[in-house]
Amino acid sequence: MKTLEQIFDNVELIGQTPNMIMKVQLPDFIFDEVKSWIEPCRSIKDNEYAELLNHRNVGTGHNTYQTGIAKKYVDNTYFLGYVINIAELYLKTINYQNVNMDGSFYRKVAMRDNPGHYDGYDIWMNFTYKGDDNPVHNHAGNLSSIIYVKDEDSQPTIFPSLNYTHQPKEGEMLLFPNHLQHMVEEKQTESERISVSYNLNILQSEQQMY
């Protein structure tokens, strides 16, 4: 069994607190779970009633389509465990002060949730084509992420406040504070671009380890 140190041995840091970005190449096993969501989400996109399940945010009307990823595809996955653990590592790296009594961040992070709403967890898939863009924006929650699922042309993500332009690779994930603004310029090529974004909450109440 791999240790957490072995699982996250390829983490890279970009910038500094309070705007630090954590970059990682997802293990193939985890990335395969992410890619398994493409067809269910594409099926929603291609349905004549797709507007009913449109994930609405700043990117709505700029990306061709965005839809939430159903909870059933996220719950009990290694992906969810990976996300929670790397977020705890992020908090440790920035010396976040709201730690448990034992000094850990165990159960300090959770997927942002929308109970009773079709969006479910605050995790969604973006389908982007020629002419699409994503204007400058930030996210809800406390920690936010981008996963580059399909991007053969490596469409850059721009972080204006850091003066940083990220050239993505498929399977790469960025984790950063929710307030960090970013954008994607208009897509000039014909290829399909697919990304996943999600938002996490930092839980403020003391949690017990059982």
Language-model segments: residues:
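Non-heme Fe(II)/2-oxoglutarate
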Residues: 1-113, 133
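Catalytic core of non-heme Fe(II) oxygenases with the double-stranded beta-helix
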Residues: 106-185, 191-195, 199-210
